[in-house]
């Protein structure tokens, strides 16, 4: 009997990336078939007001811990809650694949946001400190500036998954 593989993907971002999140979810779930099941986890957050009642940060963090792939969307600025979610992902990174997509044209003025460039420096330093295996560091340092690059990164990252299910995404053109 063939065992269906299930992969859990968490999409972390602010509501500004609604379109990208919808598109990413569509591209991922279109791959589902009798041998593959991709489950997308996402929470609709707008500042401190969670639109889905009961979605506390701890619930979100526990989902991140259980997911195989985490995709972060950020603009020029990134919110402290998203950084917190990234930290949770990194702390549990031994079996995870982390992708960072940045849309540099998106700007924020809220006080609770950190400049993305500063965050990326912190991110690189954090990786070096917590993951001493060079191949692991290389595996996680994927910054994508366009959705095409994000799709390509998922497609090319074959060796880090056995029979990487995401290679099938290559037949889809991501429009945005």
Regions found by a protein language model. Name each.
Residues 21-23, 82-84, 109-112, 176:
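A short acidic (Asp/Glu
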Residues 24, 59, 85, 118-122:
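A general structural detector for well-ordered alpha-helical segments in enzyme core domains, enriched
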Residues 44-46, 77-78, 94, 98-112:
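Short beta-alpha junction loops
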Residues 106-176:
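C-terminal interaction surface of TIR/SEFIR-family domains
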């Amino acid at each position: 009997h063939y065992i269906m593989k299930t992969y859990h993907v968490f999409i972390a971002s602010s509501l500004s990336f609604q379109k990208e999140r919808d598109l990413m979810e569509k591209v991922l779930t279109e791959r589902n078939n009798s041998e593959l099941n991709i489950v997308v986890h996402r929470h609709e957050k707008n500042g401190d007001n969670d639109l889905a009642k009961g979605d506390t940060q701890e619930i979100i963090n526990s989902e991140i811990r259980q997911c195989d792939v985490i995709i972060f969307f950020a603009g020029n600025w990134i919110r402290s809650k998203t950084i917190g979610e990234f930290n949770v992902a990194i702390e549990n990174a031994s079996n995870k694949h982390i992708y960072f997509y940045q849309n540099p044209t998106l700007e924020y003025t809220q006080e609770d946001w950190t400049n993305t460039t500063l965050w990326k420096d912190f991110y690189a330093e954090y990786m070096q400190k917590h993951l001493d295996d060079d191949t692991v560091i290389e595996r996680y340092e994927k910054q994508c500036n366009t959705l095409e690059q994000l799709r390509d990164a998922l497609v090319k990252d074959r060796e880090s998954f056995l029979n990487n299910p995401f290679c099938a995404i290559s037949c889809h053109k991501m429009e945005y």
